[in-house]
């Protein structure tokens, strides 16, 4: 009887909360608004369209919402609040600054609220609903055509448009109430679930876990916001990635890299993303082809796998606490998911490899621990595909395979002698299936084009496509500044001490954005460096005090793998191209997190928890303070 009473009370409280939220939404309705301007022709260059919309009566700088025009379409979205007869949309700047490439023509303007079209204006209606300031000169034609005569052209909504914009719409209201209510409910359930996971912990543990949850959710929100709004040209090599992704909109098989069909995918280096085995471009292309927004087309896949990674971290917030250290130690991890780069898929696969190692009941650990069962056939296949993606990744992620090899070897050597044989056979099966799948894929997708000489073809094509300073045949002294330092006579000591190698490497690991142009103040990197040293020192100290030989061997394996990671970066910068980029260091997060997972009762270690709290807060601050202001086009300057 008491249980029934409690259940009834819960339903009453839930109904009361829903009714209260309904009343609040009647006064102030959450509205996700999208304004779409379609130009008759794609404006020349990187043109930014800005909508000024906000709660105030007058226009302010904070009202700016901007997007780059892609393929003749500017699609600007923001979270709005509808109340009374207030019209939040105050003006539209069709271009960000002076435009001297001729007249511009807008064919249509559409306004969606919560996904529902509420305004759709064609050419003849646009003139009725919008006027221009003195820096917009309209033509006398029947089209909405105008010339830009100054640096601040503005389209101003008329009173008729404002009335149209503020009209009520029942479906918009209901969707705003329902979706926002569900999001609040989801957040409340997440908080409740986290508190249940740590119900036996101290107040410090409970508060920090809620902070970690906020950090993960905050990272997801900022990454999504940046991905949907940042221009392609602000991110490293994204136009080259875009060309490779768009190819797979209409193709399943990789192209012959000598084909003219992929000419647009070659940068000055003469290397195309189609040279790679990486499946990122295929996955992103096959998903993106169903969407019309240019940013969504090539970035949605990265956002999905980032969301999956965040979900796995939250789900394991206590059980596999070490996963938090991969996610919250540096905002550089978040950044590679906010634009389109194959590093995102490589990192995600490395993250799954770490999960397979530290999760007691993972596919890998069950296959290695249990006697053969039929479901293990599926496990072998999925694990081989996982490892295969690391084979297809950038060379800097090969250390993940090296790390897996060392850890599994150490585990085998610490088994009883009679257990080593069966375990070794399982290792061979996994390695054999992985290599077999690699060979099958090559024979299907590459052998018909190149035989066994793909590397030779790559070198020939690079020679043909690269600009002079980047051609392999160009004399070293005439090569581009960053190329072939070794051949230019620069010693290893000079490379490491006279070119800010370590400074750039660390800063771009701890948080640097754009084409490595936007960084924090010096104090940020100093504090992060100290926190990383404390983290490493505390982890090694705890493991060493546990006095288990296997842990000491694992520390040695991690140290050696990290050293190889460093050597790969140094070698590339010395022999190929000077690129001390922190994204090449990101795999060490997996190795450090593995060691943290081996610490006894790591959940209760206040030092490690405090360090993670600090890096979480600093990472959020860095991405919000430097990343977003420089990666979205509201404040950035055109190149």
Predicted regions and their residues:
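Start-transfer (signal-anchor) and selected internal transmembrane alpha helices
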Residues: 1-30, 169-225, 413, 424-434, ...
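Transmembrane-helix signature of polytopic, membrane-embedded enzymes
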Residues: 209-212, 296, 313-334
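Membrane-interface anchor segments at the N-terminal boundary of transmembrane helices
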Residues: 166-178, 290-304, 493-566
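Membrane-lumen/periplasm interface segments of specific transmembrane helices
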Residues: 406, 410, 423-535, 623-629
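Transmembrane signal-anchor helices characteristic of membrane glycosylation enzymes that use polyprenol
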Residues: 17-30, 206-238, 247-253, 431-448, ...
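Transmembrane-helix motifs of polytopic, lipid-linked glycan transferases
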Residues: 189, 297-320, 352, 537
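Perimembrane helix-loop-helix junctions
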Residues: 356-370, 400-435
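Loop-to-helix entry region of an early transmembrane alpha helix in multi-pass inner-membrane enzymes
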Residues: 270-308
């Amino acid at each position: 009887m008491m249980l029934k009473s409690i259940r009834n009370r819960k339903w009453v409280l839930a109904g009361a909360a829903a009714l209260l939220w309904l009343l609040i939404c009647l006064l102030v309705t959450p509205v996700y608004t999208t304004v779409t301007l379609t130009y008759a022709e794609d404006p020349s260059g990187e043109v930014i369209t800005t909508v000024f919309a906000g709660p105030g009566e007058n226009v302010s700088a904070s009202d700016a919402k901007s997007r780059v025009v892609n393929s003749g379409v500017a699609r600007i979205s923001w979270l709005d609040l509808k109340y009374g007869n207030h019209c939040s949309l105050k003006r539209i700047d069709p271009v960000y600054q002076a435009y001297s490439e001729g007249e511009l023509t807008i064919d249509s303007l559409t306004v969606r609220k919560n996904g529902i079209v509420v305004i759709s204006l064609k050419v003849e209606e646009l003139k009725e609903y919008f006027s221009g300031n003195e820096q917009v000169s309209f033509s006398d034609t029947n089209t909405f055509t105008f010339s830009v005569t100054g640096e601040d052209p503005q389209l101003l909504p008329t009173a008729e448009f404002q009335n149209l914009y503020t009209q009520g719409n029942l479906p918009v209201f209901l969707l705003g109430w329902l979706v926002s209510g569900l999001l609040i409910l989801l957040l409340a359930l997440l908080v409740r679930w986290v508190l249940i996971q740590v119900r036996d912990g101290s107040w410090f543990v409970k508060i920090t876990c809620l902070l970690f949850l906020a950090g993960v959710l905050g990272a997801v929100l900022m990454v999504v916001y940046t991905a949907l709004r940042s221009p392609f040209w602000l991110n490293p090599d994204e136009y080259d990635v875009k060309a490779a992704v768009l190819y797979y909109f209409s193709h399943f098989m990789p192209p012959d890299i000598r084909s003219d069909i992929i000419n647009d995918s070659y940068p000055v280096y003469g290397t195309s993303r189609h040279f790679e085995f990486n499946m990122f471009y295929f996955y992103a292309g096959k998903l993106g082809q169903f969407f019309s927004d240019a940013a969504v087309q090539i970035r949605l896949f990265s956002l999905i796998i980032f969301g999956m990674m965040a979900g796995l971290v939250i789900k394991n917030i206590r059980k596999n606490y070490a996963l938090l250290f991969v996610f919250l130690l540096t905002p550089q991890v978040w950044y590679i998911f906010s634009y389109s780069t194959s590093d995102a898929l490589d990192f995600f696969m490395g993250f799954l490899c770490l999960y397979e190692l530290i999760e007691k009941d993972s596919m890998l650990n069950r296959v290695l621990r249990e006697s053969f069962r039929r479901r293990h056939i599926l496990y072998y296949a999925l694990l081989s595909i996982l490892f295969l993606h690391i084979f297809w990744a950038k060379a800097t992620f090969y250390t993940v395979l090296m790390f897996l090899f060392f850890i599994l070897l150490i585990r085998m050597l610490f088994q009883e002698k009679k257990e080593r044989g069966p375990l070794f056979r399982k290792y061979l099966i996994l390695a054999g299936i992985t290599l077999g799948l690699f060979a099958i894929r090559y024979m299907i997708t590459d052998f018909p084009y190149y035989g066994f000489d793909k590397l030779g073809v790559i070198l020939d094509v690079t020679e043909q496509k690269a600009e002079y300073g980047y051609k392999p045949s160009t004399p070293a002294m005439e090569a581009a500044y960053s190329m072939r330092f070794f051949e230019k006579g620069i010693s290893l000591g000079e490379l490491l001490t006279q070119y800010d190698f370590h400074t750039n490497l660390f800063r771009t690991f701890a948080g640097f954005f754009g084409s490595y142009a936007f960084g924090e103040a010096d104090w940020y990197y100093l504090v992060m460096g100290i926190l990383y040293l404390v983290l490493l020192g505390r982890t090694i100290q705890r493991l060493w005090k546990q006095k288990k030989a296997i842990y000491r061997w694992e520390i040695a394996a991690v140290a050696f793998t990290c050293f190889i990671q460093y050597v790969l970066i140094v070698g590339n910068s010395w022999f190929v191209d000077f690129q001390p980029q922190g994204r090449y260091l990101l795999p060490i997060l997996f190795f450090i997190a593995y060691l943290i997972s081996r610490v006894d009762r790591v959940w209760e270690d206040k030092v490690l928890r405090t360090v993670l709290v600090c890096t979480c807060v600093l990472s959020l601050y860095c991405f919000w303070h430097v990343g977003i202001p420089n990666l979205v086009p509201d404040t950035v300057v055109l190149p």
